[in-house]
């Protein structure tokens, strides 16, 4: 990324594990980085169709807006531990939770490290909330012992809660 940036922004946005990294930044710098990756032997380098340079310094105005918005929101302490992906550590203080959410807008998604943290701390099942199953697949590639379940509809919430009890 440093070689491709040449005065603009190019940085690792996601460490998805299994050698899969996502980079973000200015389009010319990311395109240059993709070419460099291929030239240096990367298995492949794909340009993702995204609407913004997520998880990069170019998102700072959005992070600032999020900080302002969260200043008007009451964040409560969680009932269960919440692992902040941007620091790969549990957070429970409401002010720290808000700060980490803001930090994540420009910060790297550390999915590989997060799944490794879960495994090291006795987490055996991961629930992916939303219509996709991408994170579940990535998690199983990182740790074959982890079980995953998807919550894609309201009815799935009841099934997941029953499994937890």
Predicted regions and their residues:
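Acyltransferase
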Residues: 1-149, 155-158, 164-165
């Amino acid at each position: 990324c440093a070689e491709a940036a040449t005065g603009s922004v190019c940085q690792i946005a996601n460490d998805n594990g299994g050698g899969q990294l996502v980079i973000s930044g200015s389009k010319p710098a990311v395109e240059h980085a993709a070419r460099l990756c291929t030239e240096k032997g990367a298995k492949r380098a794909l340009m993702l169709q995204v609407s913004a340079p997520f998880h990069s310094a170019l998102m700072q105005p959005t992070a600032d807006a999020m900080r302002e918005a969260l200043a008007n929101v009451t964040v409560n302490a969680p009932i269960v531990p919440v692992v902040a992906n941007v620091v790969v550590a549990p957070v429970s203080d409401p002010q720290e939770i808000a700060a980490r959410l803001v930090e994540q807008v420009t910060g790297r998604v550390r999915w590989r490290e997060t799944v490794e943290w879960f495994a090291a701390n006795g987490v055996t099942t991961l629930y992916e909330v939303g219509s996709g199953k991408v994170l579940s697949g990535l998690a199983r590639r990182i740790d074959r012992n982890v079980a995953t379940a998807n919550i894609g509809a309201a009815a799935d919430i009841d099934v997941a809660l029953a499994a937890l009890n």
